[in-house]
Structure formats: C-alpha cells, structure tokens
Amino acid sequence: METYVNKLHEGSTYTAAVQYNVLEKDDDPASLTIWVPMFQSSMPADLLIKELANVNILVKQISTPKGPSLRVMINSRSALLAQMPSKFTICANVSLDERSKLAYDVTTPCEIKACSLTCLKSKNMLTTVKDLTMKTLNPTHDIIALCEFENIVTSKKVIIPTYLRSISVRNKDLNTLENITTTEFKNAITNAKIIPYSGLLLVITVTDNKGAFKYIKPQSQFIVDLGAYLEKESIYYVTTNWKHTATRFAIKPMED
C-alpha cells in the first residue's frame, strides 16, 4: 500500500483532507477513488496516516437527486479516528474509474491500494470558490485560471481550466482588468500546490486579499476543485510527479 503525507500547514491543529485509492473485493473489481469529508485533527500527521491505512471500507452505489452516488462506510477500531466521518456519500462520476463494473445497491468491501493525507489550515482559514461567489453582487464577468502542470517524468504538460470567481466590472475598466488581476494573483499562485482530494484540488496560499481576493483572510488557503484527474494515475504518482509550473488568467463575460 502507498501512503502519502502532504503538509501544507505545520500547526498543531489542522484540517485533514484524506483520499483513498481502493479496489473492490469481488469477481469483477472496480477501481475507486474515495475522499473523506474534511475534518479537524490535532494528531501528528505521521501517526494519523498509520491509523488511516488500517481501516475497513465498504461501498454501495446508490441513486440520489444529485445523480449516481457512492455511500461509503469506514470502520475502525481505533479511538484515534473518532473525529473522522465514518458514513458519507460522494459523487460516483468522480469516484469511479469504470462504473460498469460496480453493482447497484450492493454493499461491497474494498482493498486499500493507496492513502493520502493532506494537512491544511484550520477550518476558519479555508475559503472555497462557493464562498466567494456568494459574496459577489451583480456579477458581470468570470475569472478563469488556466493552471499548467508538468509531468516531470514524461515532460508532458496538462492545462486545467478552472473557475475562480465572479466579479462586477464596469465597461470602462475592462481594458486594464486582466493586468490588474494577474498582478493580484501573482504572489499567491507561486504558492499553489495540487493535492489529491475529490480528484484533485488546487490550494492557493493567499498573501494579499485585495481586489480579486477580497473577502479572503490574508495567509488563508483558497481551495479550487480541479476535477477527476486521478483516474489513470496513483495518488503517489500525481502528487510526486505533477508540478505546478504556471497559471494564466482569462476574464470572460458571463454567459446568459
């Protein structure tokens, strides 16, 4: 089994982002990616990852108003994992590598192939795209980040476009907007990291909360969902060999 600890915060209390790669234990096993709802922990990361690697995982494919989903049950005999959610539902479209192999409404045990733990800042120092969007009044434009990664083994590049936030812009300001936005994001983007969670996340440490980063606390972490980019690679391979190399920005008028 592979285990991986990614420390993006060194404080005594942190937010634990846990993701598993598992394989069903049946005659036609499906490969699954499972992420646990984030939780707060003060346990040393090296100890927590050992406990996380020794749990039992059961999954069942179900249908929900949000589409195909996986109900996950994690069983552990360790009291040290009391803070970790043990029953939760995740999106099957992100989780499943080969959905045709997963039976419907059948509870199936899984073998853990890899486990990743990322230590983020405490909950009050984390911000998501949804948090920012809710605070935008009368938005007119979207800020899109084009995140570039390089596989240092193959030298191949991957560009992942991701929505950051909506903003309200007057027409007379459009000519200078892109330069301003790039300047505001420049320092933060140099601190960007990718982590395995619900596929992949981009974690940006915010050094300045002016302009596009308004409403974010300085030195907090801004979390951006990049999607299901771990389907064909292991947790360890991506986090070790995918390096963030650059980010460009596009300012797009909102579509009706």
Curated annotation (Swiss-Prot):
Record keyword Nucleotide-binding present: no
A GO cellular-component term linked to this record: host cell nucleus
Primary subcellular site in the record, as a coarse category: virion
Region span, Interaction with M2-1: 1-110
Cystine bridges: none
Positions of the UniProt region annotated as Nuclear targeting and binding to host importin KPNB1: 110-183
Location of the protein in the cell: Virion; Host cytoplasm; Host nucleus; Host cell membrane
Subunit note: Forms dimers. Forms higher-order oligomers. Interacts with glycoprotein G (via N-terminus). Interacts with protein M2-1; this interaction directs the matrix protein localization to cytoplasmic inclusions comprising viral proteins L, N, P, and M2-1 and mediates the matrix protein association with the nucleocapsid. Interacts with host importin KPNB1; this interaction mediates nuclear import of the matrix protein early during infection. Interacts with host AP3M1; this interaction plays an essential role in trafficking the matrix protein in host cells.
Function: Plays a crucial role in virus assembly into filaments and budding. Early in infection, localizes in the nucleus where it inhibits host cell transcription through direct binding to host chromatin. Later in infection, traffics to the cytoplasm through the action of host CRM1 to associate with inclusion bodies, the site of viral transcription and replication. During virus assembly and budding, acts as a bridge between the nucleocapsid and the lipid bilayer. Also plays a role in the inhibition of host interferon-beta response in a RACK1-dependent manner.
Protein name as annotated: Matrix protein
Organism (species): Human respiratory syncytial virus
Gene this protein is translated from: M
